[in-house]
Amino acid sequence: MTSARLTTPIARDRSRLLRIGSRRPAGAKAILPRLTGAGGQSLCSTSHRRRPQSWNGALNLDGWSRIFDSAVHLWSLTIHWSLPLLALFLIPTRLSAWTNGELSIWFDPDRGHALEPIIQKFENDTGIKVKLESPENRTDDFAMAVQVGKGPDIVIWAHDKVGEWADAGIIAPIEVSPELRDRLLPKAWEAVLHRGSIWGYPIALETVSLIYNKTLLEGPPPTQLSELVDLNAKIKKKHPEATAILWDYNSSYYSWGILASAGAYVFGKKEKDYDPQDVGVATSGAIAGLSEIISLIRAGVLPKSVTYSTVEEQMARSKIAMMISGPWAWPNLIKSGIDFGLAPVPGVDGHPGRPFVGVSVAYLNRSSPNQDLAREFLEHCVLTEEGLTAMDHGKPLGIPALISLEEKMVKNDPLLQELKLCVDGGEVMPNIPQTSRFFTSLGAALQIATNGQASPEAALKEAAANMRHL
């Protein structure tokens, strides 16, 4: 029976936490500094404690003042130095010290069981046990754990954390051999490049596409937003309760492919690194894209408000012919019996849509003493046709980063053939920490422009200014 298993967060063991909190490595300095008062005297020492000269069963005002000042100073220092220790005590036991002879991985809960045969072989070959866990707050727990020298050896997450975690010093860079570099798709390596180093192992790529209902849509999917008004009328004529298209148009993520189609960009680059001061969300192409979206709202093709859950629900009920979404939406459509296909996101001004490409990545914990072992497991067990096929069976990966497997899977799966075209036409989402500025600023701009509070140009220029100055 393999030791690989999915575990839920372990209940906190109070006695164990107390032992962890009191343990200090041999030769290490005390965690708390010596608390001192004026003149360098220790406030915890008894040598300086003497009564004021006016002590006659009471203290004079000056004596009370000095004692009060000392107490406040002691209190502030205690709070300052005890909060990090308190955080350490509150860390769940799954974030505690490393286990000898064991490799720990934080993983997607839907994929862990599928890897058991691969893990069993690794355990038999090496004698090293592999433990899979799926914390609910994987990214937050990982960042907190690494800061105190703990956590898993490997964590699987999207590439949007590359810059943040690399700059914070919580993930380790990897040395990529020419052989390994040639095995994986170039666009996958682009996602993990930051400040001249590679910060993780790419696993798979995915993007949004135009998902269309083959029953409702007769003929080829539209390539331009400008086609949708006439197409909507045509669909309604045959299917009165249906409309042509719906997506979460106020989402920076789902609408970006339209705005980027005519040349908008998030950040420019200086050599190979992103320049967060070179912002391209208010270009003429971006303005044209947002103007087209607003035209569809005014024409009644799109509703005046929308949520993503509504989009999925309407598509599953055949109330819309098309939506913009990703592979995560496929299972619900399959379950609902929808016969669907994929096409590139439509664009503006004759250009195809250019959506974001996301890459799932295996990161190495910089604090881990097992980095060599983790690299061995990832390079020779996971990034193989057998390993990635097992992961895909647990939950669809999208386009595997491994070229040999990508070619085989795409050849045999029509949906993956269509998704591959969308990935090839997309752009890798920026991986620097400042990308969060983009999502919040552009999201606000889309909201105020689509509800008529600002023109597309004014809204996007404000978003660009906010991205530069935050």
Regions found by a protein language model. Name each.
Residues 134-142, 160, 226, 303-316:
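Short helix-initiation/N-cap motifs at beta->coil->alpha
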Residues 199-203, 208, 229-278, 320:
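Extracytoplasmic/periplasmic solute-binding protein
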Residues 92-164, 170, 178, 349, ...:
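Conserved N-terminal structural module of periplasmic/extracytoplasmic solute-binding proteins
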Residues 328-339, 348-444:
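C-terminal lobe and pocket-closing loops
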Residues 159-208, 220, 225-231, 342-343, ...:
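Hinge/lid segment of periplasmic solute-binding proteins
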